[in-house]
């Protein structure tokens, strides 16, 4: 089952989510939008197992990373009518 991994611009570039992911789905890429000059990226979402460890590791008040699990994806992203 394919999961959607969404990274928001509230990311502070701390790398906690990257280190928490057991499947190496995430990596950091250059970005000028925060002090750390990097943001999480999810180039390997096909490897995501939906454990949401990345969400748990995120230290921001508004989770900067969200994992939408399979069937939940369209509903959570407001794509159903």
UniProtKB/Swiss-Prot annotation:
| Reaction catalyzed | reduced [plastocyanin] + hnu + oxidized [2Fe-2S]-[ferredoxin] = oxidized [plastocyanin] + reduced [2Fe-2S]-[ferredoxin]
Q: What class of enzyme is it?
A: oxidoreductase
- Give any Gene Ontology cellular component: chloroplast thylakoid membrane
Classification via Pfam families: Fer4_7 (PF12838)
Membrane topology note: Peripheral membrane protein
* Sequence ranges assigned to domain 4Fe-4S ferredoxin-type in this UniProt record: 2-31, 39-68
> Cofactor: bound how, per the entry note?
Binds 2 [4Fe-4S] clusters. Cluster 2 is most probably the spectroscopically characterized electron acceptor FA and cluster 1 is most probably FB.
UniProt entry tagged with the keyword Phosphoprotein? no
Residues bound to [4Fe-4S] cluster 2 are 21, 48, 51, 54
Query: Which EC number(s) are documented for this chain?
Result: 1.97.1.12
Q: Name one GO molecular function term.
A: oxidoreductase activity
What domain of life does the native source organism fall in? Eukaryota
Look up the record and name the cofactor or cofactors this protein needs. Answer: [4Fe-4S] cluster
Q: Which residues bind [4Fe-4S] cluster 1?
A: 11, 14, 17, 58
Q: Which UniProt keywords apply?
A: 4Fe-4S, Chloroplast, Electron transport, Iron, Iron-sulfur, Membrane, Metal-binding, Oxidoreductase, Photosynthesis, Photosystem I, Plastid, Repeat, Thylakoid, Transport
Localisation = Plastid, Chloroplast thylakoid membrane
Which PANTHER family does the annotation name?
A: PHOTOSYSTEM I IRON-SULFUR CENTER (PTHR24960:SF79), PHOTOSYSTEM I IRON-SULFUR CENTER-RELATED (PTHR24960)
Q: Output the HAMAP family linked to this UniProt entry.
A: PSI_PsaC (MF_01303)
Q: How does it assemble?
A: The eukaryotic PSI reaction center is composed of at least 11 subunits.
| Protein name in the entry | Photosystem I iron-sulfur center
């Amino acid at each position: 089952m394919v999961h959607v991994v969404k990274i928001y611009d509230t990311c502070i570039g701390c790398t906690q989510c990257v280190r928490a992911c057991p499947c190496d789905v995430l990596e950091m890429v250059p970005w000028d939008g925060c002090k750390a000059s990097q943001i999480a990226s999810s180039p390997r979402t096909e490897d995501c197992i939906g454990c949401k460890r990345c969400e748990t590791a995120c230290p921001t008040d508004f989770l900067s990373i969200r994992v939408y699990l399979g069937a939940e994806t369209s509903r959570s992203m407001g794509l159903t009518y």
